[in-house]
Amino acid sequence: MVFTSPAWCSQLASTIPETKLVGDFVLEGNGTESGDKPLLVCAETGKSYNIGVLENRVDLLARSLMRVFGWSPNEGAPEDKVVGICSFNAMDFVPLSWAIHRVGGICLVLHPTSSAAELQSLMRQASCKALFTCRDLLPTCRAVLEALKLESSRLFLLELPADEQTTQAQPVSVSQLIADGESLPPVDKVALQDGESKHRVAYLCPTSGTSGYQKLAQITHKNITSNILQAVTLDGFATRTAPEVALGILPLSHAYGLVAFSTLLYRRDTVILHARFDMPAALRSIQQYRIQRLYVVPAIVAALVNNPILFKLADLSSVQSLIVGSAPLSKELVGALKRVRPEWDLLAGYGLTEAAVFVSCTSKHSIFPGSVGSLLPHVEARLVGDDGAEIQDYDVAGELFLRSPSIMKGYLVDDATDSGAFDADGWLITGDVASFRKGPDGEEHLFIVDRKKDIMKVKGIQVAPAEIETRLLSHPAVDEAAVFGINDAEAGERPFAFVVRSKMVNVDLDEKALRQSIHSHIQETLSEPFWLRDNIKFVESIPKGHSGKALKFKLKELI
């Protein structure tokens, strides 16, 4: 059975371009006139860019990159023009990536929390020729370039607010490149043949690496332009007249943040950009800029629910909707937030780097708590059971297979390894277990169960760690949680949880009492195979990949 998007959003708002770079597509926009209105605002300094400034900075950066690297937009293979960006969120992060595209190159996005070994490995995989980074990461990145035998002149500074105030000697900065571009000739337009945007890679994006190995997903220009159009169509904003103000806290070094940012600019929304996530600073931004839309992850929602004092730090009355991605948003968490903020629309979604990035999202047209919404237009989905047979019914879980114009070109690896990402008919094998259910209004909704490799069998019963994690996060004394299966002589497997205690709730409880409280909390709603008993370990932090997902293979080493 092939599942598709609802009938009311089956057609895209406009045709997917076949010969356009993603940056040019976003800068042209959806037809909404923005004039001098700020589209990008630095939360720390108030510095802003309107559409004209953005276009000018991309143009001048491209001129300088062409001179510095000696590249011509229409000569040489894009694979030989890979430039990396390893930085926290900077005003020029995305404009820089678009300038790289304009000289015929590919942008490798690298997370700023990556180790030197990780950076070295990914840059070597990509044959990266140069790297832009922020001041805090200069020592690490200098060592990486030296290990890769790249000249120090191939390291550049992408300024953050603090960087712009320093007088210390630094590598050539983006600001200097833009200034130099004023006196340089224009860059020829990249000449894409009809249909070439489907194959030309725009970004190399590391996957989440929750199993310990990061692959580089090849995301093409058409992948992203498709996903932008898919998102605005389902979201119902394709024909709206009033742009919104959005909170920009997602890391631009991750596909979720990168595509969400591009979508907002395409719609001519204003993005209030934070270099790093800081809850009090984010809340102050909401009050100062009257922010209406928040792009967040479930951990942020859980923090708000479990720490009501946060609602008193700022006036949040402007907020209208939360787009929640990266992990499923449980029905319990939705209910808890609705009790304190009933006027907020919680729009849960599902995506993955390999789909660049959104696959489904909840629309205001059809809300089904606990689901990750409806499939985006032009997305097709199948569910395959453990026996390899295709599932034909609702409410039956199976591995999720996808087809969409936003699906990546493939991994940057040998064909033999890459072939495991797709089946014989070209469907992406996600590795996620999911089901479809019909909501009260009769619309199909997608539910994510867990990663296939993470599901354990307790006394022959399938137990999804995500279900236990969801319940744990609803305990007021739990800030973070990660669950996986361990061997058990009697049951085959049993769940084991790593828990980060709240620093604000039940701080006086000793570990034994808190462990019992958590166990009772689990017992209230989950059956015996899901119980943790004494399988709880308290830790200061949970190691995470660059997508924010727990690195469970590292936790298993701590038992």
UniProtKB/Swiss-Prot annotation:
Binding residue positions for ATP: 207-215, 348-353, 432, 451, 549
EC number(s) on file: 6.2.1.-
Pfam families the record matches: AMP-binding, AMP-binding_C
Applied biotechnology: Due to their effectiveness as antifungal agents, echinocandin derivatives can be used for the treatment of human invasive candidiasis.
Pathway: Antifungal biosynthesis
GO molecular function: ATP binding; CoA-ligase activity
SUPFAM superfamilies for this protein: Acetyl-CoA synthetase-like (SSF56801)
Sequence segments annotated as region (SBD2): 349-411
InterPro entries: AMP-bd_C, AMP-bd_C_sf, AMP-dep_synth/lig_dom, ANL_N_sf
Enzyme class: ligase
Gene3D superfamilies in the record: 3.30.300.30, N-terminal domain of ligase-like (3.40.50.12780)
Keywords from the UniProt entry: ATP-binding, Glycoprotein, Ligase, Nucleotide-binding
Region feature (SBD1): 278-348
Glycosylated sites: N30, N223
Role summary: Fatty-acyl-AMP ligase; part of the gene cluster that mediates the biosynthesis of echinocandin B, a fungal lipidated cyclic hexapeptide that acts as an antifungal agent. Linoleoyl-AMP, produced by the fatty-acyl-AMP ligase ecdI, is transferred to the initiation carrier domain (T0) of ecdA. The linoleoyl-S-phosphopantetheinyl-T0 is sequentially extended with L-ornithine, L-threonine, L-proline, L-homotyrosine, L-threonine, and 4R-methyl-L-proline to form the linear hexapeptide.
Stated family: Belongs to the ATP-dependent AMP-binding enzyme family.
Comment, domains: Both substrate-binding domains (SBD1 and SBD2) are involved in the substrate recognition, and are sufficient to confer the substrate specificity.
Protein name (Swiss-Prot/TrEMBL): Fatty-acyl-AMP ligase ecdI
Organism name: Aspergillus rugulosus
